[in-house]
Design a protein with these regions (language model features):
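HTH-adjacent hinge/linker in prokaryotic transcriptional regulators
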Residues: 1-75
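Short helix-capping/linker segments at secondary-structure and domain boundaries
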Residues: 12-14, 207-216
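Short acidic/histidine-centered micro-motifs embedded in hydrophobic/aromatic stretches
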Residues: 22, 26, 80, 222-226
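Glycine-rich phosphate/diphosphate-binding loops that line cofactor/substrate pockets in enzymes
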Residues: 73-85
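Glycine-rich phosphate-binding loops that contact phosphosugars or nucleotide phosphates
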Residues: 83-212
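A short, charged, Gly/Pro-tolerant segment at domain boundaries
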Residues: 215-237
């Protein structure tokens, strides 16, 4: 053990425990990728029946959802809802962009205080620096592999005192260290990992609508009335 401790110290670590933790994290970094599970799915033999693919996708989705409901995620969900804001800014880039846009698409119908940052990436620094205040909240979607620009923009918001909610699929996400609230679906190595991210999104929107009632309800009623008045309930070409 003396030889091991000398090696650990030679590598720049204070203790064997610290060395093991760093080694484990490095191993996860090397082997954690959402693309690995996709490659495995695509490489299955052509003899596999379509119904088997359907069943396997459902089974993986169920496992992902079971892993989502942890005491930590439950408490962090509550903490996210408790954050009050003048404006809710949404950020998601690359593989996280669809989630950010979906949140805006649904929530803005009943909650008009949403500002989307994901469409004009060239000006995202400007909007954070000029428009946001500590009374706002930044909701960040950042799934692995994390986009550098997302991390830098989130760090800028953090330095400006903007509270941050992070929705991610792995605890390896660098923003875990600075986010005020972290909901980690732990689904990075699952082909159905986005299922959990969508469920978190739906839950956040549902609770947001409930807590902003009756304003949220009135906004939905206004939309329904406008659609009825203009004959748009049954869409025409």
């Amino acid at each position: 053990s003396t030889t091991v401790m000398r090696l650990v110290q030679l590598l720049g670590f204070d203790s064997y425990t610290t060395f093991k933790k760093a080694l484990a994290q490095e191993s996860l970094l090397k082997n954690t990728t959402p693309y690995r599970s996709l490659r495995q799915e695509f490489s299955r033999t052509s003899e596999t029946a379509s119904r088997d693919t359907f069943h396997m996708a459902i089974a993986d989705g169920i496992q992902v959802l079971e892993n989502l409901c942890t005491p930590s995620n439950i408490s962090q969900f509550e903490a996210a809802i408790q954050l009050e804001s003048d404006q809710l800014y949404i950020l998601g880039m690359r593989s996280s962009k669809a989630l950010a846009l979906y949140f805006e698409y649904v929530a803005e119908r009943f909650y008009p205080h949403i500002r989307q940052l994901s469409r004009e990436e060239e000006f995202v620094y400007d909007r954070i620096a000029i428009n946001t205040t500590p009374k706002d909240v930044l909701l960040v979607y950042s799934v692995w592999p994390c986009t550098k620009k997302t991390i830098r923009v989130a760090e800028l918001a953090h330095n400006l005192g903007i509270p941050m909610i992070l929705i991610t699929n792995t605890s390896l996400n660098p923003l875990v260290k600075i986010a005020d609230v972290v909901i980690d679906t732990n689904s990075v190595n699952h082909p159905s990992g986005d299922t959990a991210l969508m469920l978190v999104t739906e839950a956040l929107m549902s609770e947001l609508g409930r807590r902003t009632a009756p304003e949220s309800t009135k906004n939905i009623e206004k939309i329904e009335q406008a659609l009825n008045d203009n004959g748009l309930i049954l869409w025409e070409n």
